[in-house]
Curated annotation (Swiss-Prot):
Protein's organism: Burkholderia pseudomallei (strain 668)
Subunit structure: Heterotrimer of A, B and C subunits.
Function of the protein: Allows the formation of correctly charged Gln-tRNA(Gln) through the transamidation of misacylated Glu-tRNA(Gln) in organisms which lack glutaminyl-tRNA synthetase. The reaction takes place in the presence of glutamine and ATP through an activated gamma-phospho-Glu-tRNA(Gln).
Name recorded for this polypeptide: Glutamyl-tRNA(Gln) amidotransferase subunit A
UniProt xrefs under SUPFAM superfamilies: Amidase signature (AS) enzymes (SSF75304)
Substrates-to-products reaction catalysed: L-glutamyl-tRNA(Gln) + L-glutamine + ATP + H2O = L-glutaminyl-tRNA(Gln) + L-glutamate + ADP + phosphate + H(+)
């Protein structure tokens, strides 16, 4: 059952092969049996089964949409009424939200059943899911490896068959990189496509929610429910609703050859994504995927994104600056952790934040406060914003000669748990191929395309697909065509 797609699971519900309650119970048992992965931080079977019973009633009355009765896990950065909403931090360890994030509310309105909240890097700051106050998540493909971050709990849950789908967020690669490391499909939509209301903020000009699942087709179904204008989010885009499944299974160009469904598609390959630093085994998997695309009729076109290397310093000025501002609200007074002993109000602020935040969050708050301080704002923050604009312009120049851009989602496969904990810069470098996409506000996704080599033979590789603004439906079409021709996305870790 856990290997079925969302469409297949819904067909099973419609055929009465199982009920929503039975489906939820199936996944709850799997979650309980896989506690060692540490993918979930909060599960409440009573709440889950109550939602499943409501879904069964809707299905019986013929009132259900295409997602009704299907289980989903939510990254613990989305506030969720009834479940704790911690953002992976001691600061919010016991926080109970009085409302649902828009993403949660929309998926619940579509009839989806919440299985629980998934583990994550604290306040979404990390690339390995080792920065969680609740301990690291293990990669189901190789439990000595990280699952990626910050949406590592979500990627591990989908890969291990603990949930058929999960929500994630992506600020600098936090959907795409863990999707790559765990061998699942994940998409970061265009900035503003998915509401940030109720999504605990890290960097407001970068944060974007998106779906994670086994396939592009499943992600398209989820995005149909998640995307759309929300007046409660000032950055939400006012655009007509779309059906993100509308191009799936169709030829790229009208009248195209069924044997060459992607004839006419131009794939841009940035030279900067295939240079020094890209592991040989990752390069081999990406090259093989590109050959599959050529066999499907696509044409490979060289392009250049010359400011790719600058995306790391630019991101690590802008994101910490915004985090410094956003996290100032956690002071121990209004909500969040409060120190047990303190002398006065200022001491309470200091101790509450010192005790509540982990090392990586403190590091980024300090960096952000520094770059926003008097005398440094112009030299760092404003300069970073200027280069950010140039990075976005570079993408637009590249898109003049191609329809989508492809390359690796990460320069390496997943590394061992603890391998980079003492060197944050090496951790930051792992996001070299995803950061610029976030800085430009473009949509990007990762699809499974193979595995590493040698000692890394059990560790997945993800192909990154980057589209122009609002091109999610076409990107999903391109990913879906690849997945119809390959089986990387349906492979499962041993023992699952």
């Amino acid at each position: 059952m856990h290997a079925k797609s969302l469409t297949e699971l819904r067909a099973a519900l419609d055929a009465k092969e199982c009920s929503a309650v039975e489906l939820a119970q199936h996944y709850l048992k799997r979650i309980d049996a896989a506690r060692d992965l540490n993918a979930f931080v909060h599960v409440d079977a009573e709440l889950t089964l109550a939602q499943a019973k409501a879904a069964d009633a809707a299905l019986a009355n013929g009132e259900a949409g295409p997602l009704a009765g299907l289980p989903i896990a939510h990254k613990d950065v989305f506030v969720t009424r009834g479940w704790r909403s911690t953002a992976g931090s001691k600061m919010l360890a016991n926080y109970a939200s009085p409302f649902d994030a828009t993403v949660v509310a929309r998926l619940s309105a579509a009839g989806m059943v919440t299985l629980g909240k998934t583990n994550m890097d604290e306040f979404a700051m990390g690339s390995s899911n080792e920065n969680s106050a609740f301990g690291p998540v293990k990669n189901p493909w190789d439990t000595s490896a990280v699952p990626g971050g910050s949406s590592g709990g979500s990627s591990a849950a989908v890969a291990a068959g603990l949930a058929p789908a999960a929500t994630g967020t992506d600020t600098g690669g936090s959907i795409r990189q863990p999707a790559s490391f765990a061998g699942v499909t994940g998409i970061k939509p265009t900035y503003g496509r998915v509401s940030r209301y109720g999504m605990i903020a890290f960097a407001s000009s970068l944060d974007q929610g998106g779906p994670m699942a086994r396939s592009a087709a499943d992600c398209a179904l989820l995005l149909n429910a998640m995307a759309g204008f929300d007046e409660r989010d000032s950055t939400s885009l006012e655009r007509a609703d779309e059906d993100y499944t509308r191009h799936l299974g169709k030829a790229w160009a009208a009248g195209g050859d069924a044997g060459k469904p992607l004839a006419g598609l131009r794939i841009g390959l940035p030279a900067e994504y295939f240079g020094a630093g890209l592991a040989d085994d990752v390069r081999a998997a990406i090259d093989a995927a590109l050959k599959t695309y050529e066999a499907l009729g696509a044409t490979l076109v060289p392009v250049s994104l010359p400011k790719t290397e600058l995306s790391i310093p630019v991101y690590y000025v802008i994101a910490p600056a915004e985090a410094s501002s956003n996290l100032s609200r956690f002071d121990g007074v209004r909500y969040g952790h409060r120190a047990a002993e303190y002398r006065d109000l200022l001491d309470m602020y200091k101790k509450s934040r010192a005790e509540g935040f982990g090392p990586e969050v403190k590091r980024r708050i300090l960096v952000g406060t520094y770059v926003l301080s008097h005398g440094y704002y112009d030299a760092y923050y404003l300069q970073a914003q200027k280069i950010r604009r140039i990075i976005a312009q570079d993408f637009q120049e590249a898109f003049k000669s191609c329809d989508v851009i492809m390359g690796p989602a990460s320069p390496t496969v997943a590394w061992d748990i603890g391998a980079k904990g003492d060197d944050p810069v090496q951790m930051y470098l792992a996001d070299i191929y995803t950061l610029s996409v976030s800085l430009a506000g473009l949509p990007g996704m990762s699809v499974p395309c193979g595995f590493g080599a040698g000692a890394n033979a059990k560790r997945p590789v993800g192909l990154q697909i980057i589209g122009n603004y609002f091109d999610e439906a076409r990107m999903l079409q391109v990913a879906d065509a690849f997945q119809r021709a390959t089986d990387w996305h349906v492979q499962e870790p041993a023992g699952v």
